[in-house]
Amino acid sequence: MGPHGKQSVLRMPLLLLLTCVQSGTGLESINYAPQLLGATLEGRLTQSTFTLEQPLGQFKNVNLSDPDPIWLVVAHSNAAQNFTAPRKVEDRHAPANFDRNGYYLTLRANRVHYKGGQPDSQLRVLRVGNDNNCSLESQGCNSPLPGAGPYRVKFLAMSAEGPVAETLWSEEIYLQQAQTFREAPGSQGKGTVVIIAFLSILLAILLVVFLVLVISACLSTSGSSPEEQVRMRHYHTHHMGSLRAERSS
């Protein structure tokens, strides 16, 4: 056997070994990307939450037992490409370490929750960031998202031995931002000046009318004339005149 034949014989066990290592550490990839709920739903995007469709039927062929957890991975968009599935879910994967890790795990479920093909009248959704009461340090906390994003999410199925399967990353998700009122340059300033001028003129007119009314009222209620005062001083009642007539008689 020549030297090339010997090299081929030596390479075969090495290739088999590499194949076994890769298959043992690789994750099953599920050809599914998480989707935002339809645009017609009010509140699917807010300043701190977003709403996903449930991955119904996506884990039915995965080698999992029913109690095995399926997590939702929430990541900063720029950290998604560097994400490595943890061998075990720990406290460091809670939202408190979101900025340091670039991701956190939340909304623990199992494939029983995500069974598909069953008629259901209820709208089955996942509301990310909808829990204001959980501790940021606790595993699975679904706390409000800290900013507008962008974010990416994926589902990660795990067993007691470690990660088993994962979906694709979603598209970038941007949350709503608070809108600040800004005056339109030029046009709104001129309109404001016109309104202020009109109100000033109206106020001046009302003030003049008020002064005229006050002056008129003062003139009409001024003191009586001297003639009226004389008449009032010499006025005697009928009763007093009768008494004087009786005395003179």
Swiss-Prot record:
Residues 216-249 are cytoplasmic. This is Uroplakin-3b-like protein 1. Residues 1-26 form the signal peptide. Its main location: membrane. One of its GO terms (cellular component) is membrane. InterPro entries: Haem_peroxidase_sf, Uroplakin-3. It is a single-pass type I membrane protein. Glycans are attached at N63, N82, N133. It comes from Mus musculus (Mouse). GO terms for biological process: response to oxidative stress. The gene is Upk3bl1. Belongs to the uroplakin-3 family. Keywords: Glycoprotein, Membrane, Signal, Transmembrane, Transmembrane helix. The chain crosses the membrane at residues 195-215.
